[in-house]
Curated annotation (Swiss-Prot):
Taxonomy of the source species: Bacteria, Pseudomonadati, Pseudomonadota, Gammaproteobacteria, Enterobacterales
Enzyme Commission number(s) of this protein: 2.1.1.223
Family: Belongs to the methyltransferase superfamily. tRNA (adenine-N(6)-)-methyltransferase family.
Keyword tRNA processing found: yes
Single GO BP term: methylation
InterPro entries, per database record: DNA_methylase_N6_adenine_CS, SAM-dependent_MTases_sf, Small_mtfrase_dom, tRNA_Adenine-N(6)_MTase, tRNA_adenine-N6_MeTrfase
Gene: yfiC
Protein species of origin: Salmonella arizonae (strain ATCC BAA-731 / CDC346-86 / RSK2980)
Predominant location: cytoplasm
Single GO cellular component term: cytoplasm
Top-rank EC class of the record's enzyme: transferase
Keyword annotations from UniProtKB, A to Z: Cytoplasm, Methyltransferase, S-adenosyl-L-methionine, Transferase, tRNA processing
SUPFAM superfamilies: S-adenosyl-L-methionine-dependent methyltransferases (SSF53335)
Subcellular location: Cytoplasm
The name this protein goes by in its record: tRNA1(Val) (adenine(37)-N6)-methyltransferase
């Protein structure tokens, strides 16, 4: 199924192979999520866990990138967002292998009897303090419902020995997250610093951690070139998804 020849729909984001409605989700489809979903390593992946799936964006992107026998579990605490994710999945080509769970990951994870070789999350990163317009948006953006130490501990209990935990965070918060992860026994294996253009400092960082030690590969990604069009590297990373690339 492809939406490439269809009329663009409102209240969501149209990709080449699927549509993500997000009008009932606190966090909308954005560059952070698209970067993470396109970047996460999927070679030899057999089972995927998406923590805090929101609209289902990451689950859908990873389903597109993996073999048809790879199950994806997507966990979302907010009932309204989870319902929208379920609808997005149902209208996608991968409804048979993506399961959306309306639950708190801290309750859901201990009940699982299988481990995941890819765990992915676009996690909250603001400390509580500044009020949000809605409780749902606060939940999606603030670490009060899932702090980074808890996320790392849950992932450690759910991951295979050679699996990857992948996140996207603002640069400075990503550095603190890395220190927290290293102190808990994780190993940083992949890091991509993301800048808007060559003249700017990185503002986001893509991180992949593993329980297994190994060499860490680091690089830099620039989103836009001098002409303000998407750079060759960003296009190469995301062109399987963006409708007009």
């Amino acid at each position: 199924m492809s939406h490439s020849g269809s009329v663009l729909r409102r209240n969501g984001f149209t990709f080449k192979q699927f549509f993500v409605a997000h009008d009932r989700c606190a966090m909308k489809v954005g560059t952070d999520g698209i970067l993470l979903g396109a970047w996460a390593p999927v070679a030899d992946v057999k089972r995927i866990l998406d923590i805090g799936t929101g609209s289902g964006l990451l689950a859908l992107m990873l389903a597109q990138r993996t073999d048809d026998n790879v199950p994806v579990d997507a966990v979302e605490l907010d009932a309204e967002a989870a319902m929208q994710a379920q609808e997005n999945v149902a209208h996608s080509p991968w409804a048979h292998r993506i399961t959306v769970h309306t639950d708190d990951i801290q309750r859901w994870a201990p009940r699982q009897t299988v481990r995941f070789d890819l765990i992915i999350s676009n996690p909250p990163y603001y400390e509580p303090g500044v009020e949000c317009a809605t409780p749902q948006r606060e939940q999606a953006r603030y670490t009060a419902t899932l702090d980074h130490q808890t996320l790392l501990a849950i992932a450690a209990d759910c991951i295979t020995e050679d699996g990857f935990l992948c996140v996207v965070l603002p640069e400075q918060i990503g550095n603190a997250f890395t220190q927290q992860a290293l102190s808990m026994g994780w190993h940083l294996r992949l890091r991509t610093d993301v800048a808007e253009n060559e003249a700017r400092l990185p503002h986001r960082v893509l991180l992949a951690f593993s329980p297994q030690a190994g060499e860490c590969f680091s690089d830099r990604l620039v989103i836009r070139g001098p002409d303000q069009h998407y750079s060759e590297s960003y296009t190469a990373l995301t062109q399987a998804f963006y409708l007009f690339m």
